[in-house]
Structures are given as structure tokens and as C-alpha cells.
């Protein structure tokens, strides 16, 4: 790969960080030039070619920007949200007090700032709060921006170093900002669609099919929205998202949420003929009612992204094979690689009434399961007001019958998917049982006490319990003390000791194989090779232009007092 076009040495870098600035024009010029130095010559050629510009000072047209970002048709709100975000970022580091149209320089800064690795290199700091910058860019609207006053333009007394400029966020107080919940919902929906459509930095984009499923992805996006603010259960327009809610949710339970946006922005560095086809998981999940593209996208925000590089293998679908332990065992137990168990159903809101009047089998289940008292439960608004309940369990070990002992390694975890997202990790090995003598399935439980005339479940402090007929399930969360820790989100919010229990009537149970380590390693190598091959073609294409200096000058890469960088 061609080297960066930067010509500054480490000594020069150090001296520039200590340099002081007194006006906005010099600050913007410094960061614009620094942005250009961060990219390679092939990347810069592709960038200018995609936008059809010769000079980085050229404003980018709205049409060119929309075409490059593959926005869904008839979704004006997401177009406005994202283009506004880019306008704010393009004026970095003066997001509040300076406003200019998006130029080539500005868009180049957007790409760097939205990429975690590039951002750290661009700003020469690994501790920079990238989430705060993104939140500011989403919450500052065009009408909020302040025009530079004559006083601020001529304020030569205030001297700022690079570090002060970067860490000051242009004096924007995030405590005073919020993002309307309906705006955030649109943004999250778009990100989930990108998770499916844009899995790599160099994948061809053809998002017509997934854009047609906007409504399905919106349902999953609502789960993520309620993860940020659990009070969003009714009128979305009356709610908003604070920076604390935004940052906490992403850092704890959806760390991969922004990766697709990174991938999309990196597409500016590839010409169309350098992109490659990438097979998605969509073909393997066509027959599923639960493992939809939208749910798969949501899962990938919190689980290791490597799990979703290869196609998922359908092992057991209850609606097809029947809801029974025997059917599940016959379909799943020969799979020797990691798997994901997904269960979905409707929460039983009034247990006593439902047991007495609607389902005598549930009354029998309550006699065997020690239910928490209603007075002891502390549910948030999302659990109280939303009945749809979905959980996934990632299981690294092969399944096996365990009527007395347990299986499952330290990678086992329960993921709450709906009505909000949280992740519950094990703190010891051996947390799962598959009991074929009437005990059902338990994650985080003790083995049930089974006698000829009675049965007693022993739920763990954090646990997911299935009855032996796969008709009922219970998720319990009463804090520390069990083989699973409280949810990552709950612990971050200091809510781990707020007990609650979700009883639900199972509507779907599915098990999906994730592929073995060998297959995963091969597919990761294939993706890395494809990306390297795309970059190699970039260099070859650029070399073919090398004989025509006029073309390079037109691209702004040589001449015009530039060294041209290194190939």
C-alpha cells in the first residue's frame, strides 16, 4: 500500500502540537492540511474520482453526497440527519462557532473522525472521546450554529494549543444537548441496515432489498433506542436521548454499532471497479421468523463481529420441527461448533389470572417454579409496558444431555434483545443444563429437583429457564451471587440490584450454528485478502497514470507545491 502523503516528522508533529493559534482561519487550515496528510495517494485519487473534484476546497454537491452514501429513497429525515452530521464534522474542530459548506477537505475530515483507528492517528491521541464528537454532530442542528461575530474573528488575545482545541470540543456543553428520540430512531435504523449492506470497507453496495425492509429494521432499532432511554415506550416524539444515555449504551452493550458507518465512509477511498461482491447471511435465514436480517444486525452490535462473517447454519426451528426437547436434541446435538439459541414470546403480565382462567398448564408450571413476589420487583418502563420478549444465548460448547452436570465455557452469555438490549456474561464454566428427564433447559440455574411425584426448579440470580415442553420460559435478574453476572448495562447504570422476572409464553425457539474456528479463520483470511487486493489494484491503477503528469497535477497530487507522497 502506498505510504501516507504526510511529510512531517515526529519532531515537527511535536512542535505543531505546542503551536498556538489565535484565529479560526488558521485552525481550520491546520486541520485541513493535516487531514490530507493522513491518507495515501491511491486513497486520495479514489476520493477525488468518486466526488469528481480536482481541488479539495471544492464544495461537495448535495446530490454527489447522497449518491455516494446510498441513502434509501423516500427517507428525507435520515438524509437530513446524516448530511447535517457531516456538515458539523466537516468544520472540525470548530463545530459550533464556524460554519462552511462541506468541501473535499471537510468530507476528508469526516471520514477520519468517524473511523476509530484513523481518528486516533489524526488527532494523535487514543483517549479522545469519539462518541462525544458524534453526539455533538448529531445534536447540533444548522439553526443552532452561531455565526462568527466580529469580536470573535478579531480576538487575537486568546491563544489555544492543538491539544486545547481538540479536547475543548469548541466549548460545546453536551449536558445542554439532546437528540430527539425520533431522530435517533431513524439513525439507528439506518445503521442496522448498513450492518447488513456494508459489512466491509470494500463491499459493493446494493441495498434495494434491505431498504424495502426498513420497517423491520425499525423494530430492532426501537430495542436499541429503549436501551438508551427505557422510557421510550409510547409517544416517541415526546422523548429525547442525552449524551450520558447515548454513550453508556454504546460503550457497554452495542460496541459494534458504528462499525458499518466506518465501512461506508471508507468507500470514498475505493473506486467502483475496486469494490468486491460480498455474500451476506440473508440467504441462510430466509425461512426464519426470528433470526431475521434485522435481528441479526442487532445481535452483531453486541456480539463479536467475527460471528457474523460466515453464514449461519439453521439447526433447529421450532415452527418446523416441533416444540420439543427431543426434536431440538435430534437437530442440534451433532453440531460441534458454537451456536446461538434464540427464544421469543409474549410476556405474561398477570400470572395468577392467566394461570387460573386461560392456561392450566401454566398454573402447574407456577407450582414448580418459585416466582418472585410482585412487590419485590423493580421493572423499568420498557419491561413494564412492552410484552414482546426476545433473548439469545451464545453457546461456545457442543450441546449435550446433562441430567446431573452442566456444560458451557466462559464465553457463554445471555443477550436480551427485546424490549431492550443487555448482555449477561458467565463468571464460571458449566452454566447450562439440558435435562431430558423433565427438567427442561437452564442457563444459570441449578439442576431441578425431580422426584416421582414432584418437580422444583432452582433458578439462579441471573438465569433463563425453559420448561420441558418448551411452552414457557422465565428470565430472572436479582443481582450478584449466581453463575452469571448482572447485565453490563444494568451494572453501568448501578441498577444491578433492581430485581425483576419476565415470564413469557414461548412463540419461537431456534438454534443457529455459527461455524467452527477453522472455517471462521479461513473466511477472515479471505476478507483480508480481498481488501488487500482492492488496495493493490488502487496502486496499479495509479501507476498507470504515473506517465501522464498532467493528470496527476489535475488530481492535485503533484505540482502545486506538493511532493506527491510515496508509492
From Swiss-Prot:
Q: Does the keyword 4Fe-4S apply?
A: no
Q: Where is the TLDc domain?
A: 289-515
Q: What is its main location?
A: cytoplasm
Listed as disulfide-bonded, the cysteine pairs are none
The entry's function note states: May be involved in a process influencing telomere capping.
- Similarity section: Belongs to the RTC5 family.
**What is the protein named?**
Restriction of telomere capping protein 5
Amino acid at each position: 500500500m502506498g505510504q501516507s502523503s504526510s511529510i512531517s516528522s515526529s519532531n515537527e508533529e511535536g512542535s505543531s502540537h505546542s503551536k498556538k493559534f489565535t484565529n479560526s482561519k488558521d485552525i481550520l487550515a491546520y486541520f485541513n492540511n493535516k487531514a490530507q496528510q493522513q491518507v495515501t495517494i491511491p486513497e486520495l485519487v479514489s476520493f477525488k474520482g468518486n466526488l469528481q473534484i480536482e481541488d479539495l476546497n471544492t464544495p461537495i454537491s448535495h446530490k454527489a453526497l447522497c449518491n455516494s452514501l446510498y441513502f434509501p429513497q423516500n427517507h428525507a429525515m435520515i438524509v437530513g440527519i446524516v448530511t447535517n452530521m457531516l456538515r458539523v464534522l466537516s468544520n472540525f474542530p470548530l463545530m459550533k462557532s464556524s460554519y462552511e459548506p462541506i468541501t473535499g477537505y471537510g468530507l476528508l475530515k469526516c471520514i477520519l473522525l468517524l473511523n476509530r483507528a484513523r481518528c486516533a492517528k489524526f488527532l494523535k491521541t487514543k483517549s479522545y472521546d469519539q462518541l462525544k464528537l458524534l453526539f455533538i454532530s448529531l445534536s447540533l442542528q444548522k439553526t443552532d450554529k452561531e455565526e462568527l461575530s466580529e469580536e470573535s474573528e478579531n480576538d487575537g488575545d486568546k491563544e489555544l494549543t492543538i491539544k486545547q482545541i481538540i479536547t475543548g470540543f469548541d466549548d460545546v456543553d453536551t449536558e445542554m444537548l439532546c437528540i430527539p428520540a425520533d431522530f435517533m430512531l431513524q439513525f439507528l435504523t439506518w445503521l442496522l441496515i448498513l450492518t447488513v449492506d456494508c459489512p466491509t470497507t470494500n463491499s459493493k453496495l446494493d441495498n434495494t432489498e434491505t431498504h424495502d425492509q426498513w420497517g423491520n429494521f425499525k423494530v430492532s432499532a426501537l430495542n436499541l433506542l429503549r436501551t438508551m432511554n427505557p422510557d421510550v415506550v409510547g409517544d416517541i416524539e415526546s422523548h429525547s436521548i442525552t449524551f450520558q444515555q447515548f454513550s453508556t449504551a454504546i460503550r457497554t452493550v452495542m460496541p459494534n454499532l458504528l462499525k458499518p458507518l466506518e465501512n461506508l465512509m471508507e468507500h470514498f477511498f475505493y473506486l467502483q471497479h475496486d469494490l468486491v461482491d460480498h455474500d451476506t447471511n440473508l440467504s441462510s435465514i430466509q425461512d426464519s421468523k426470528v433470526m431475521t436480517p434485522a435481528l441479526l444486525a442487532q445481535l452483531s452490535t453486541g456480539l463479536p463481529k467475527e460471528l457474523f462473517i460466515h453464514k449461519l447454519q439453521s439447526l433447529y426451528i421450532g415452527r418446523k420441527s416441533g416444540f420439543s426437547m427431543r426434536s431440538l436434541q435430534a437437530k442440534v446435538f451433532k453440531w460441534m461448533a458454537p451456536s446461538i439459541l434464540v427464544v421469543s414470546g409474549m410476556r405474561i403480565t398477570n400470572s395468577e389470572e392467566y394461570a387460573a382462567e386461560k392456561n392450566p398448564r401454566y398454573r402447574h408450571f407456577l407450582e414448580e417454579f418459585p416466582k418472585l413476589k410482585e412487590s419485590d420487583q423493580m421493572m423499568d418502563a420498557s419491561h413494564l409496558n412492552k410484552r414482546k420478549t426476545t433473548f439469545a444465548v451464545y453457546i461456545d460448547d457442543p450441546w449435550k444431555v446433562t441430567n446431573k452436570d452442566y456444560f458451557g465455557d466462559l464465553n457463554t452469555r445471555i443477550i436480551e434483545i427485546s424490549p431492550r438490549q443487555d448482555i449477561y456474561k458467565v463468571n464460571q464454566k458449566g452454566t447450562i443444563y439440558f435435562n431430558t428427564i423433565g427438567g427442561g433447559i437452564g442457563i444459570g440455574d441449578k439442576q431441578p429437583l425431580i422426584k416421582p411425584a414432584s418437580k422444583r426448579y432452582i433458578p439462579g440470580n441471573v438465569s433463563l429457564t425453559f420448561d420441558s415442553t418448551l411452552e414457557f420460559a422465565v428470565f430472572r435478574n436479582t443481582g450478584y451471587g449466581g453463575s452469571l453476572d448482572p447485565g453490563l448495562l444494568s451494572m453501568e447504570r448501578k441498577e444491578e440490584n433492581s430485581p425483576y422476572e419476565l415470564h413469557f409464553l414461548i412463540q419461537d425457539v431456534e438454534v443457529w450454528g455459527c461455524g467452527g474456528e477453522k472455517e471462521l479463520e479461513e473466511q477472515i483470511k479471505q476478507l483480508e485478502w480481498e481488501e488487500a487486493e482492492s488496495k493493490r489494484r488502487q496502486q496499479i491503477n495509479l501507476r498507470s497514470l504515473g506517465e501522464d503528469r498532467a493528470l496527476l497535477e489535475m488530481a492535485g497530487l503533484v505540482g502545486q507545491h506538493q511532493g506527491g507522497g510515496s508509492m
